[in-house]
Amino acid sequence: MAGSYGAYVLRGDVMNPNYNQTVTLYNCFRAQDNPESRKDIWQRTVLDRCFYKNVMGQVESRDGLKMANAYTVRIPESEKYKPYHEWIKLSPEERAGYFTCSLKDMIVEGECLEEITGATPFTAAELLSRHKPEAFVVTAFSDNTSHLTGKHYRIGG
């Protein structure tokens, strides 16, 4: 089930004008955390008024330097956010009203209507492949909502 939320900065802070992108966040309810299923379950959420940046740069590898994309997404603080350990405790119906962010989740730039079912051609890997380079797997996450201003969730990949 997909949700769509306009993420706003709360408590009267002024909206950052760079937060003008839409992203689709795919949250993975991992099989090891779900006693009712032996497979990952994916939830799609469309988030408006976010910051999205995709930069091509050099990274070191075993074989020397290579070119790779580096992604940064910032989502303004939202009442619809739950930390993963709280999100997984919600019923499926309640979970549909919230989003979370954790490693191995996926982000696609823009509004993506595809669902991840786990069956070909709707696997996470296939969705990622279809939408590259505008899609990535989350490899870094920080909750920056304790800041005095500009409260947000930062996602990297």
List the model feature ranges, each with a label.
Residues 2-8, 39-156:
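Short, conserved turn/kink motifs that form compact alpha/beta structural patches or helix kinks used as
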Residues 2-36:
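Polar/acidic, low-complexity leader/linker segments enriched in S/T/G and N/D
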